[in-house]
């Protein structure tokens, strides 16, 4: 055997050399005619090298990843349903398929390195459909643009001024600017829609209006306000777009409007929805901070929570809450009643290991950060069909 790749010289005589290599499920032989001279040996060796280069990149049948069986749709009341779409975990899945010569180059020089999710946490989707994922494990932010087949990684790790240490939650505004909380540096990093760093808000130097551990974030582009939960201060800071504090909401405690380690938050019309992690619930407040109602309590049965994480709202106003410990997503109506839940602890499609962030786009696609499985899983909620206007066509 000449090479482990499968290219072999099987016979040699004074009159001919025969090369054989695998082509899919068949074997192809090449006859190299000529007498046993230095010239024939030269061309024979050249042919061997060429075939070695071409066999992995072109001739051999590409190995296909075993596909997961399609998950059945979850059928809900009133003709609604929830479908599993896909998962993704690396830059490789965004880039277009590489052509023949690129594969040859990859074989000679080695395949390019692709970034993968390490310990993803939070997620947002901008108006262009780009999926933005914070990754404390990689100390940066991944931007997956499947429509344009582009990928970008944002990081300020190791920067002398305003270094990024532990990116947590992410939000986007109406102009697709990106806002990232950093729980260790105590700042909010702002990038423009192209991913260029703009500024940092907040400080750890102390004093009212400075963050200790910023986590959840939401942006109101109309009112020009930024909402940030500070988990250690047990309150929500409301900032203007320059980073000045204009209002604080909440205090430490267990009653309505009080928090015990608040984390994620979302804006919904005039409502402010906050994950109250160590009170094992989600509180719904108005923009002034007045309490409206709460969902959940500690427990291990449907409708209860143990480690509430990401939250989101679909087009019908139903509230989705990730439970990181139980590995499920629970769905509540506006009255706080549990409608259904999906997921389970595991590694298969539709299962989660320590899920964290959640985002629902305007098409009711549900993105769940499956943190310990190092991936994002995508589901699609199909609600009640709205009657068409204007009569029949």
Residue ranges and their predicted role:
Residues 44-54:
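Bacterial N-terminal signal peptides
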Residues 58-393:
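Eukaryotic scaffold repeat domains enriched in small/polar residues
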Residues 28-46:
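Bacterial N-terminal signal peptides that target proteins for export
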Residues 1-2:
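Short, small-residue-biased leader/transition segments that mark boundaries at the very start
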Residues 5, 20-23, 32, 44-45:
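Generic detector of N-terminal low-structure segments
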Residues 7-9:
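Compositionally biased, intrinsically disordered low-complexity segments enriched in Pro/Arg/Gln/His
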